[in-house]
Amino acid sequence: MTSIIDPKKYTKTVDLLRSFFLSKGFFEVHTQNRLSILAACEDPETVATYEYNGEIWPLPQTGQMWLEYELLKNPEAPGFFCVSTSYRQEPNPVEGRHEVIFPMFEFEMHGGVDELKKMEVELCEHLGLPELEIDTYDGWGNMFNAKELEHEHEEKIGYGMITDFPEFTSPFWNMSRNDDGATSRKIDVILNGMETIGSAERSTDKEKMRETFHTISDGEYANLLYKLFGKERVEKELEEFLEFDFFPRSGGGIGMQRLMQALS
């Protein structure tokens, strides 16, 4: 189910990432001791739960919400990052591509999708990776004569960047949408033929975030959270998040094992 991670490769990789973000003045956050319902991703089929101190919680899939929390509470900081563990109860894992428990390196920063793209290109240069070919989701789709990009297309991309994801790909509820209303300001970085960095500009539109929370994955995401944790708890946590004063910001998560493969 899960692979044993080589400590030497892991140390080298996490040190490269830490040094990059620390050089930009980012602060490291410990997120694993923080309980949150909204720490689940957009695919409701992969959420697993545990009971702690008399309440049911989702096994965390991301530290993103806590990094956003820190940036929104401390806007004077350049950014934040964390090393987290993601639990993905994949119903049909693809061997060699999917780990059901894996380490992630996540970051949150000021600026929109243009600043995010620039930073990720700089990060890949810092890591010594090949130059990235950049195109939109539809652009890559036209290249491969495919409406929906699959694993096989990522393998053909090799090293590249996919931008402007259509709504049918179920972008996360707090991702910023483009003015066309049909695509999101989301970027996936493909390294060694696999999606390794998933990132996006965050929304500043409270009403749009509230609406999208209830409609992503055809409403299954919100309904599953209600079923597992109760509507009152879920809505309370959502509304507490939406009380923040939002500003342009972006962030993403890096799959450590996939990055280690790309670097080896």
Where are the regions that the model predicts?
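Short, well-ordered alpha-helical packing segments
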Residues: V14-R18, H30, G63, S84, ...
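A generic secondary-structure signal for well-formed alpha-helical elements
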Residues: L17, F21-K24, C124-E131, S217
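A translation/RNA-centric and nucleic-acid-associated enzymatic feature enriched
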Residues: E45-D114, K118-M119, L129-S264
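TRNA-binding/sensing appendages of the translation machinery
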Residues: M1-T46
